[in-house]
């Protein structure tokens, strides 16, 4: 589905150059759940921004569904982002002046979806995240877990192929964090590709694969079924997300 080849990212000021990413090579297959881990400042969010077409690499190639997006115009990148990608952020990024339904509806407005179709889709996705009873409430009236469920509803309403999640449980307690991770798992089971940046080993345990970054480089990749398999002769175990094991 997507391939990064020798991706580099440098941030320049008048006095210094800071290399955020160096020679990153990464492939994510359709339907995979990949967790990206590493210490603060290692380049995780920069990598996610490049994957999400919110930033461009200084060097290297990014192929998404067979297209070299690093060579696209900004307008073409925006169109591709709207059609294929959904975003979930640690800080929720809901608009305070809009209620739950209106926040969830926003991506469809930008896509020019007719009003009647928008309303039906909003109703369905809000029900999916168990927020129907809060549809007319504003973000300030919701708990952190409820706000993140609304953010996920907004991310998936356009049926994106890929969800990019940046510390989706970072502002939540363990109970609400589990609810959010279980919801991401449901989407993964339905075939959505998920790429998640996290500091939490608990959350990473939901993934099929963990990619570890250090100082802007990929230093290791771990297939979770391999990590759990003690006897190579045994059949591969069920991927962790399919078992919902992250907070057990």
Regions found by a protein language model. Give the residues of each.
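ABC family nucleotide-binding domain
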Residues: 1-207
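Conserved beta-strand-loop-alpha-helix hinge in the C-terminal portion
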Residues: 209, 217-242, 246-248
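A cytosolic small-molecule/anion-sensing beta-strand core signal
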Residues: 214
């Amino acid at each position: 589905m997507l391939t990064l080849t020798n991706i580099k990212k440098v941030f320049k000021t008048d006095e210094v150059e800071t290399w955020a990413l160096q020679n990153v090579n990464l492939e994510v297959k359709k339907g995979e759940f990949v967790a990206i881990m590493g210490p603060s400042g290692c380049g995780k969010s920069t990598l996610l921004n490049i994957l999400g077409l919110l930033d461009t690499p200084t060097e290297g190639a990014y192929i998404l569904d067979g297209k070299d997006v690093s060579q696209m115009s900004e307008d073409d990148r925006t169109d591709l982002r709207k059609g294929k990608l959904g975003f979930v952020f640690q800080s929720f990024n809901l608009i305070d002046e809009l209620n739950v339904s209106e926040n969830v509806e926003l991506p469809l407005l930008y896509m020019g979806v007719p009003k009647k179709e928008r309303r039906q889709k909003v109703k369905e996705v809000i029900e999916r995240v168990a927020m129907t009873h809060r549809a007319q409430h504003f973000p300030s009236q919701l708990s952190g877990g409820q706000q993140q469920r609304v953010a996920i509803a907004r991310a998936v309403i356009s049926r994106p192929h890929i969800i990019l999640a940046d510390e989706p449980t970072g502002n939540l307690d363990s109970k609400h964090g589990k609810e959010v991770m279980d919801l991401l798992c449901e989407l993964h089971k339905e075939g959505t590709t998920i790429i998640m940046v996290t500091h939490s080993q608990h959350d990473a345990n939901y993934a099929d694969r963990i990619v570890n970054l250090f100082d802007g480089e990929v230093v290791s990749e771990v297939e979770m079924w391999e990590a759990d398999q003690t006897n190579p002769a045994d059949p591969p175990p069920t991927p962790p997300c399919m078992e919902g094991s992250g907070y057990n």
